Amino acid sequence: MSLNITENESISTAVIDAINSGATLKDINAIPDDMMDDIYSYAYDFYNKGRIEEAEVFFRFLCIYDFYNVDYIMGLAAIYQIKEQFQQAADLYAVAFALGKNDYTPVFHTGQCQLRLKAPLKAKECFELVIQHSNDEKLKIKAQSYLDAIQDIKE
């Protein structure tokens, strides 16, 4: 099947219009939610079994096809954190926080990444935000533990 230039331009325009209106590749390709859930299950299973490279492939796919799903972004961020790619992880955690609104889990993990990036003041800001704004008491306790541990560190 060959497409002429006009057909290619029409398809390109339709895809760009769809993306500009907020559609994801999942939507454009009509991938059902249950299929995405199955792929997520594989990614999560690989992650839990320590098969990080395989998990990364699946989480990358999920993020590319549905960049609005916080679980997919958190999964890929966790992979980067495990692989000690802390700046990439922190960047993805920031996206997850922006999409997730009131869930401060990504902010907590950003704080962990900032510590590993040797930026204790940034880490402190993250942990303080968690304590001030999170509704998750367990997460607040963890954040306070980090704050207590780094209280005397200067950048």
From Swiss-Prot:
One CC-aspect GO term: cytoplasm
Keyword Chaperone appears in the UniProt entry: yes
Keyword Cytoplasm set for record: yes
Pfam families on file: TPR_3
A molecular function GO annotation: identical protein binding
Main location: cytoplasm
Keywords, ordered alphabetically: Chaperone, Cytoplasm, Plasmid, Virulence
InterPro entries (alphabetical): T3SS_Ca_resp_chp_LcrH/SycD, T3SS_Ca_resp_chp_LcrH/SycD_sub, TPR-3, TPR-like_helical_dom_sf
Compartments, as annotated in UniProt: Cytoplasm
Function: Assists the correct folding of nascent IpaB. Once it is bound to IpaB, it binds to IpaC and impedes their premature association that would lead to their degradation in the absence of IpcG.
Similarity comment: family membership: Belongs to the LcrH/SycD chaperone family.
Protein name according to UniProt: Chaperone protein IpgC
Lineage summary: Bacteria, Pseudomonadati, Pseudomonadota, Gammaproteobacteria, Enterobacterales
Gene: ipgC
